[in-house]
Regions:
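Short catalytic micro-motifs in class I SAM-dependent methyltransferases
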Residues: 74-78
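A conserved beta-strand element that flanks and buttresses the S-adenosyl-L-methionine
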Residues: 71
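A short glycine-rich, Lys/Arg-flanked "PGG" loop and its adjoining helix->strand segment in the class I
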Residues: 85-97
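Class I (Rossmann-like) S-adenosyl-L-methionine-dependent methyltransferase catalytic domain
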Residues: 1-49, 53-63, 83-86, 100-175
Length: 176
């Protein structure tokens, strides 16, 4: 099984996958956080985690061979709508038949939506943090038009509480 994590951040999820003996390629513009997490892996598990400092939007995924899953947790909010238009077909075209695209992202129903400075559609800068909030209806139609089949969808809070933040998230599992 090969998983590509888009925007791996500190690498927590990629490290978890590697501990489960799943091959994971963790892509982030900065891999310094993942390097710290990777030190917690046993030597035998280190072979399952591959770190790449790249822009996941413009990556050529055809060079990875067989890809079983793409995983995006709190990353689609960090790219522009134009980048999303490039990324989604790229994922679909490079995913194995029957492969999965797993997404967790803040939506336009999130309490932070509309707070801060509007810089483009559904995108706000609040406390020096830029977020693009996803309109779930439009996004689900877009991925269906690309060819994905929806296996699971939920949009609600209480999915990923962190300190005082209880965001409204979309969790979506798509199949090619």
């Amino acid at each position: 099984l090969k998983i590509i994590e888009l925007g791996s951040g500190n690498g927590r999820d990629s490290v978890y996958f590697a501990k489960q003996k799943l091959n994971v390629v963790a892509i982030d513009q900065s891999i310094s956080g993942v390097d710290i997490e990777k030190k917690n892996l046993l030597d035998e598990d280190n072979n399952y985690l591959h770190l790449l400092a790249k822009d996941f939007v413009y990556e050529d995924y055809s060079k990875y061979g067989s890809i079983d899953a793409f995983y995006s947790r709190f990353t689609l909010h960090s790219i522009t709508k134009i980048d999303e238009e490039i990324l989604l077909p790229n994922i679909y075209n490079n995913l194995n038949s029957g492969g999965l695209f797993c997404i967790e992202v803040r939506t336009t129903k999130d309490p932070l939506f509309g707070k801060g400075e509007l810089c483009e559609e559904n995108t706000f800068i609040n406390n020096n943090h830029k977020r693009r909030f996803i309109d779930t209806d439009k996004f689900r139609k877009k991925v269906a038009d690309i060819g994905f089949r929806e296996l699971y969808f939920v949009e609600k809070n209480n999915l990923s509480i962190y300190k005082n933040d209880n965001p409204v998230l979309m969790r979506l599992i798509l199949e090619k």
